[in-house]
Amino acid sequence: MPETDFEEKMILIRRTARMQAGGRRFRFGALVVVGDRQGRVGLGFGKAPEVPLAVQKAGYYARRNMVEVPLQNGTIPHEIEVEFGASKIVLKPAAPGTGVIAGAVPRAILELAGVTDILTKELGSRNPINIAYATMEALRQLRTKADVERLRKGEAHAQAQG
């Protein structure tokens, strides 16, 4: 799939400073999500001395860190709860017409993944970086019913032989 099929959304830009003899020197960090709105989404955090460079790097990292989301009628196959650091996110499947009920950070990721109906809740720390990573980890852990059946069949087969 060509790189141009991906939509890019900036979630966060932050400025950090270090002290030099002549004063403060700034660096920028950018958190960017890329997705095709058809089940593929990636997240990247880029750091550089200038904002455009940081955003460019973040986009590059996001394209290297893609996740395939198993969508079912515009929602996810099952409820999932994931912790990342002190942040926790809960994703719940929703009926068609519900929309994306989510905070700004999970909303950006879920919309670019192609999710149209979902309920979410952020718990614990609301740090946008940790929430973004928790959301991506939740999407990475999603399994369809067929996936689980295939995995369990493999386990049963392995146990029978062992």
Curated annotation (Swiss-Prot):
* UniProt xrefs under PROSITE patterns: RIBOSOMAL_S5, S5_DSRBD
| One GO CC annotation | small ribosomal subunit
What keyword terms does UniProt attach to this protein? Ribonucleoprotein, Ribosomal protein, RNA-binding, rRNA-binding
Q: What is a single molecular function from GO for this protein?
A: rRNA binding
The residues covered by the S5 DRBM domain are: 6-69
| Cystine pairings recorded for this chain | none
Which GO BP terms sit in this record? translation
Is Nucleus tagged as a keyword? no
Q: Does the keyword tRNA-binding apply?
A: no
Q: Which InterPro entries match?
A: Ribosomal_Su5_D2-typ_SF, Ribosomal_uS5, Ribosomal_uS5_bac-type, Ribosomal_uS5_C, Ribosomal_uS5_N, Ribosomal_uS5_N_CS, Ribsml_uS5_D2-typ_fold_subgr
Query: What NCBIfam families does this protein's entry cite?
Result: rpsE_bact
The remark listed among the other comments is: Is positioned such that it could physically interact with spectinomycin.
Q: Which family does it belong to?
A: Belongs to the universal ribosomal protein uS5 family.
Briefly, what is this protein's role?
Answer: With S4 and S12 plays an important role in translational accuracy.
Q: How does it associate, per the subunit comment?
A: Part of the 30S ribosomal subunit. Contacts proteins S4 and S8.
| Domain topic, free-text comment | The N-terminal domain interacts with the head of the 30S subunit; the C-terminal domain interacts with the body and contacts protein S4. The interaction surface between S4 and S5 is involved in control of translational fidelity.
Q: What is this protein called?
A: Small ribosomal subunit protein uS5
Organism expressing this protein natively: Thermus thermophilus (strain ATCC 27634 / DSM 579 / HB8)
Gene name as annotated: rpsE
